[in-house]
Every structure is written in structure tokens, then in C-alpha cells.
């Protein structure tokens, strides 16, 4: 591993531990040339997933796009960084466990909405309004009406 301070390639590992719920390894290293200490993360390299956009274009899966969308949808709610990372980790895990290595962006959006529905209704509506390209209040009303039966069922199961 190349030292960020002196670019020497000789270092020793001082400490290793699991990170990201076991999906990566965090290593604390020390450069053998300048004694600079730095941290590295190792992650299993997975098969790339292609995303088929609405326009028909293809691009590689980019988790930061989901994180950015969730950050906007969850702004001023109680959902913050670690929960957003968890949602994206779960979606990415589902994608990598799937047989197909190409997925439509619409399917990814639905996966995000499935997670948000259980966590925060406001974030769900915000994400849905952008993802489903709402054109007016009727689109909001339809989505809100679709959420109502779910809440009634949850209340009935508690009673």
C-alpha cells in the first residue's frame, strides 16, 4: 500500500477490524520509511451492475446517486447519514445477490421507495415526487391515498 505522505510502498499493518457490517476490512497501517500512520479499507470487488436509464442509455451502478437522492428526500427529517448508508447498503446487497447484472433505474427507485415507506412518510413522498416525476397535486394525492390503507392495516394489527 502506498504511503500518502512519502509514496513509499512498504508499510506494516498495525490493526485490522471489520467495517461496514462485515462488508469491508479497516486496516491501520504505518509506513516503514517515514513512520506516517494511515487507514485503508478493503472491500470485495463485485461484478459491476449496469443500470438501464429511462432514456435507454446504460451506465454503471453508482451508489452515490442513491445517497444524493435520499439526502434530498430526507432533508429536515430524523433520517440521517448512517440510516441512509444502511438503506443504500441493503439495496446494493439485493442487487449483487440478484442473478441479472442489468437493472432498470425504475426498479432501483422502487427499491428505495420500499425502504422509505417503512421509515418516513415525508421522505417517501419527497422521493416519489422526483422519481415518479409528479406533474401536479393530483399525483401527490394519489400517492398519499395509496399510503392510507397501509397505515390503517398497521393500526388494525396493533389493536
From Swiss-Prot:
The keyword Mitochondrion does not apply. GO terms for molecular function: ATP binding; DNA binding; zinc ion binding. Residues 49-139 form the ATP-cone domain. The keyword Repressor applies. GO terms for biological process: negative regulation of DNA-templated transcription. InterPro entries: ATP-cone_dom, NrdR-like_N, RNR_NrdR-like. Binds 1 zinc ion. Keywords: ATP-binding, DNA-binding, Metal-binding, Nucleotide-binding, Repressor, Transcription, Transcription regulation, Zinc, Zinc-finger. Residues 1-20 are annotated as: Disordered. Its cofactor is Zn(2+). Residues 1-11 have a biased composition (Polar residues). It holds the Pfam family Zn_ribbon_NrdR. A zinc finger (unnamed) spans 3-34. NCBIfam families: transcriptional regulator NrdR (TIGR00244). Negatively regulates transcription of bacterial ribonucleotide reductase nrd genes and operons by binding to NrdR-boxes. Belongs to the NrdR family. This is Transcriptional repressor NrdR. It comes from Prochlorococcus marinus (strain NATL2A).
Amino acid at each position: 500500500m502506498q504511503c500518502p505522505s512519502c509514496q513509499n510502498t512498504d508499510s506494516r499493518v498495525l490493526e485490522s477490524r471489520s467495517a461496514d457490517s462485515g462488508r469491508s476490512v479497516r486496516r491501520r497501517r504505518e509506513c516503514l520509511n517515514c513512520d506516517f500512520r494511515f487507514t485503508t479499507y478493503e472491500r470485495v470487488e463485485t461484478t459491476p451492475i449496469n443500470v438501464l436509464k429511462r432514456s435507454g442509455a446504460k451506465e454503471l451502478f453508482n451508489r452515490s446517486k442513491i445517497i444524493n437522492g435520499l439526502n434530498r428526500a430526507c432533508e429536515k427529517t430524523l433520517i440521517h447519514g448512517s440510516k441512509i448508508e444502511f438503506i443504500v447498503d441493503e439495496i446494493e446487497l439485493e442487487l449483487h445477490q440478484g442473478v441479472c447484472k442489468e437493472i432498470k433505474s425504475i426498479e432501483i427507485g422502487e427499491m428505495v421507495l420500499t425502504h422509505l415507506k417503512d421509515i418516513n412518510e415525508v421522505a417517501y413522498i419527497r422521493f416519489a415526487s422526483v422519481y415518479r416525476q409528479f406533474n401536479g397535486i393530483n399525483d401527490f394525492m394519489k400517492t398519499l391515498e395509496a399510503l392510507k390503507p397501509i397505515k390503517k392495516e398497521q393500526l388494525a394489527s396493533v389493536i
